[in-house]
Every structure is written in structure tokens, then in C-alpha cells.
Amino acid sequence: IKNNVLNFDDLKDRVNTITYMSATPSKFELDNSEYVSELVTRPNNIVDPKIIIKAGEYFGGGKMINDVRDTIGKGETVFINCISRKSVSNIHTLLSHNNIESEVIHFKIKQDKRKEILRDLRGGKINVIIGINMLREGLDVKQCSLVIIEQASRNNFLRTKSCLIQVSGRAARNINGEVFMCCNHISSSLAGAIEEIDYRRGKQ
């Protein structure tokens, strides 16, 4: 008698019908689906955020600081998505030097601290969040109107089409939602993300 945990292939052999549900379905789900049904309109009836391309030099520069300051001045929230822990630290220090309070979210933060940060976000005590992978999903804050993404065209697992769409979605709860993609060229993943978001905006 085999008494081991089923792997994915074992599961597929034992299941006749599977329903995949995802906001960002991968090639596997699409290729293995006989029928695909779209749900593009959001429950809050707000369109997906507008995508704006910024030069790579914008990230960490004076114009970015001004945009962050303008956004929080309206009582709204900014999410800054970095490419590395070093970049997170640099941006956190930069904001501090410009008298802008911010919090950092990363995988080492305990659940209680994460809940506290989310509570302070929704309560308006925190206006800027900086992170890497933790900003992809699960942070639904209606005050977030600006997402800034570092090196949006970089070719790695943090900048796939799916990840870019997920990070952009953090600004989808606010009617003023915008996403600044910082890059000096357009990668295929970034182009795909922009195309998908524009498609959704058109339908919404």
C-alpha cells in the first residue's frame, strides 16, 4: 500500500473534471481548459488602474518623491514594489530622509505584525508600503491609488506577465488607481501585462 502524498501527476490521473479559477491564469490552465469564461467586471465596478511607463531613472528620484508626497497628501496610499531587499532598504531610507513615513513588508514579518500593518494602512496611520514579493496579492486596500514598480521589464520570476498584473491590481480598489512601470525598454512580459490590463479596461 502506497501511503505517500499525491503529486500533481497523481492527482490529474485520479480527477475527471477540474475547474480552474484565477485572476491570472497560466498557460497550463488555459491549454488544459475546454471552456474559458471571463469575469472582467470587478464587484466594486472600478476599472483596472491606468498603466503609465516611467523611465528607469524615475525610480528613487526626485520626481518619484514628489509623486509619493502628492499622493499621500490626498489621503491616499502608495505601494512601492522593489526588485531586491537592498532596493527596499534604499527606498525606505530615501523616504525617511524626505520625511515620508513608510513600512516594509517582507516574508520574515510575523503574522501579527502583518495584521498590524494592514490595520494601520486601512486606518490611515501608514501611507507608504515597500516590498518585493509580498505586494503581489492579499493586500487589498481601497486607499491605494498608486503602485510604483521598479525594473518592470526585468526578466525574472518577479516580473512575469502574471506577477505584473497581480502587483498592478493593488491599485484596482481606488477610482484614481495608477501604476507606474519604471523601465528603459518594454519586455515581452511587460507588453503582455499592459495588453491584458488595457483589454480589461476596455471591457469594464
PLM feature segments, named:
Residues 15, 21-25, 82-85, 132-134, ...:
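A short beta-strand-to-loop transition that corresponds to the Sensor-1 phosphate-sensing loop
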Residues 71-94:
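Conserved strand-helix element at the start of the C-terminal RecA-like helicase core
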